[in-house]
């Protein structure tokens, strides 16, 4: 089986992290976002992954060549010369997708969830039509475009954009499976699959919805990235509790790379991931944070709801909170307060940031 992953965007919502790497290569719980998706696809029997690339494609290609060998699968690059929206990339990759008559997966690159790929194949084959969308339940449907479908069969009737009165609380989760016939609907031009292709398919009775049972998050911006981390760690607690770090000073769900060094009298957790080669000095307090590869947290620093980018340094007695994000190789001097700061790569912070703002 094949899968196409839409990885061509600039990832502007996840800056400053995406100024250093393309969004699919940002580390989420100590593994690039893209790798979470690819490994789940391989587990479900996918042996050929096609990446629809444009921004920083060289970096993606280099990383995925290594993964291709490790996973024993074929990974192809489909290069967009201009932005093609969410449907155009399918037309561009048509030759690769139609090498056989099997259905194929299509994924948005910033989705993290309990990937239901095997169930999708069964559901899609059962109804026998052109397309299946995975839908997920949300608390506030008025923020989203919702999917209205028959409860028993899953046949989609219509889509409603940001409804003001309740019609459905199910939204498109960005995971699809299609039969190759769907490609006859898509031309090689900038096209929205959600606004142009799906409504026509629904009208013809060719599109079905399958409800996701586990957690789901679009982690395309820092606030949601941290929420997604909490959900993922809870899922790890249920499925692979042995992956989590336990011991004195560790609270709740904490993921620590074996190469990280943790000092004395720290309080870490709940909901923390600590990456490879990270050093946490004595007396540090961390909760609801991601600390990426090669960073150092100096003694008695206090971090909550923050993301520390690769190879950054947080000084002694620093306090960081309220979705503060440090890009790659940022230095925060001692005894400063950062409240919702968004710090671009390679900066040195020498004064406090009492109100949320971007540091350029």
Curated annotation (Swiss-Prot):
Residues 2-222 are annotated as: Substrate-binding domain. GDP-alpha-D-mannose binds at residues 110, 218. The keyword Membrane does not apply. One of its GO terms (biological process) is GDP-mannose biosynthetic process. Mg(2+) binds at residues 110, 218. SUPFAM superfamilies: Nucleotide-diphospho-sugar transferases. Belongs to the transferase hexapeptide repeat family. The N-terminal substrate-binding domain adopts a Rossman-like fold and has a binding pocket for GTP or GDP-alpha-D-mannose. Substrate binding is coordinated by an Mg(2+) ion. The C-terminal domain consists of a series of tandem hexapeptide repeats that adopt a beta-helix conformation. The beta-helix forms several protein interaction surfaces involved in assembly of the GMPPA-GMPPB mannose-1-phosphate guanylyltransferase complex. This is Mannose-1-phosphate guanylyltransferase catalytic subunit beta. It comes from Xenopus tropicalis (Western clawed frog). The lineage of its organism: Eukaryota, Metazoa, Chordata, Craniata, Vertebrata. The gene is gmppb.
């Amino acid at each position: 089986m094949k899968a196409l992953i839409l990885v061509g965007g600039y990832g502007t919502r996840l800056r400053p992290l995406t100024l250093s790497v393309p969004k699919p290569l940002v580390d989420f719980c100590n593994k690039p976002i893209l790798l979470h998706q690819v490994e789940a696809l391989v587990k479900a029997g996918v042996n050929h992954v096609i990446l629809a690339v444009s921004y920083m494609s060289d970096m993606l290609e280099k990383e995925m060549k290594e993964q291709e060998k490790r996973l024993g699968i074929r990974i192809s690059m489909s290069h967009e010369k201009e932005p093609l929206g969410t449907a155009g990339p399918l037309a561009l990759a048509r030759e690769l997708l139609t090498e056989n008559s099997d259905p194929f997966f299509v994924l948005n690159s910033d989705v993290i969830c309990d990937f239901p790929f095997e169930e999708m194949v069964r559901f899609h084959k059962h109804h026998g039509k052109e397309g299946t969308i995975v839908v997920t339940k949300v608390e506030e449907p008025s923020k989203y475009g919702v999917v209205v479908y028959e409860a028993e069969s899953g046949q989609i009737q219509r889509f409603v954009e940001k409804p003001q009165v309740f019609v459905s609380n199910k939204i498109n989760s960005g995971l699809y499976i299609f039969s190759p016939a769907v490609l006859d609907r898509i031309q090689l031009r900038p096209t929205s699959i959600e606004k142009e292709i799906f409504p026509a398919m629904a009208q013809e009775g060719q599109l079905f919805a399958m409800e996701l049972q586990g957690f789901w998050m679009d982690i395309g911006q820092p606030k949601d990235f941290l929420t997604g981390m909490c959900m993922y760690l809870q899922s790890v607690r249920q499925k692979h509790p042995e992956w989590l770090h336990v011991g004195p000073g560790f609270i709740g769900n904490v993921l620590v790379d074996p190469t990280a060094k943790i000092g004395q009298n720290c309080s870490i957790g709940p909901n923390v991931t600590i990456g490879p080669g990270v050093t946490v000095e004595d007396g540090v307090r961390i909760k609801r944070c991601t600390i990426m590869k090669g960073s150092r947290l100096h003694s008695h620093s206090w971090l909550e709801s923050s993301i520390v980018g690769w190879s950054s340094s947080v000084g002694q007695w620093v306090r960081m909170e309220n979705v503060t994000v440090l890009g790659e190789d940022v230095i925060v001097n001692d005894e400063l307060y950062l409240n919702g700061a968004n710090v671009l790569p390679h900066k040195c912070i020498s004064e406090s940031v009492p109100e949320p703002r971007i540091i350029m």
